[in-house]
Amino acid sequence: MPSPSKDRQPIRAGDVLHPVHPGEVLAEEFLGPLGLSQNRAALAMRVPARRVNEIVHGKRSVTADTALRLARYFGTTPEFWVNLQAHYDLEVARDASGARIASEVMTLGEAA
């Protein structure tokens, strides 16, 4: 079994896991392993380098347009990128508001 990288530690019971931003996937699963710079990818996708940089650093969301471009460039599907973003957004919202919403909103059965 491969050992964790120097940046990653084994997951232990009780650990709180942060949501994974699509930019982290882009950097760690695509750019890094393929030896691609953010600038090179941006040029090939015909987007500003700043867009790729902000996505990689979790400061920008993957839009439908960017998902189409990432999919074309890396040979994936746009749904892959959009689903990563949607999952991230839901996890962030759940962490921020999930408990409050659960206490405020009645279920259909409770409201009847």
PLM feature spans:
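Short, basic-rich loop-to-helix N-cap that marks the start of a DNA-contacting helix
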Residues: 59-72
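Alpha-helical residues within the helix-turn-helix
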Residues: 32, 43, 72
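Short alpha-helical DNA-recognition segment
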Residues: 36-54
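N-terminal flexible/basic segments that precede or flank functional cores
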Residues: 1-28, 33-34, 101-105, 110-112
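Short, charged recognition helix plus adjacent turn
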Residues: 82-112
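The DNA-recognition helices of helix-turn-helix-type DNA-binding domains
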Residues: 48, 59, 74, 85-88
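Residue-level signal for the short linker/turn that defines the boundary of a DNA-recognition helix
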Residues: 35-36, 65
